[in-house]
Amino acid sequence: MLIALMTILFLGGGGGSSAVMAYFAESQDRVKEVVIDDVRSDEAVDILKSMQGLGKQQNEAWQDVFKELENEFGEHESDEDAIDAIWDDYYRQLREINDEAVELRFELREQLTREEWEQVFN
């Protein structure tokens, strides 16, 4: 389930959607209930908050590219190179966000036992 949500989150352009953000908030609550060790629980919650932050970053990047493209297309003569540069910058940002998301997923996996993982995400 987490992998599917991360895929939607970071590849689907809806990183800041309320449903995805709610999922991360609910996951934080489940971690607090399931993980008895306070140190690991706190670390896992912090990682989930970071993932939630990445979703917000992705949403902001999408909003920015939309505004930039809107401005560029609003020009009488749109510059193809400028449009390509806007998309290139957006995809660069997405790659960075995606790379960080994968790293966070592995960090989260290290904090939870297999049983805890299943209880939190299944």
Regions found by a protein language model. Give the residues of each.
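Immediate post-signal-peptide N-terminus of mature secreted/exported proteins
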Residues: 1-3, 7-56
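Generic signature of intrinsically disordered, low-complexity segments enriched in small/polar residues
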Residues: 26-27, 93, 120
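Amphipathic alpha-helical segments
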Residues: 37-108
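Long amphipathic alpha-helical coiled-coil segments
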Residues: 108-122
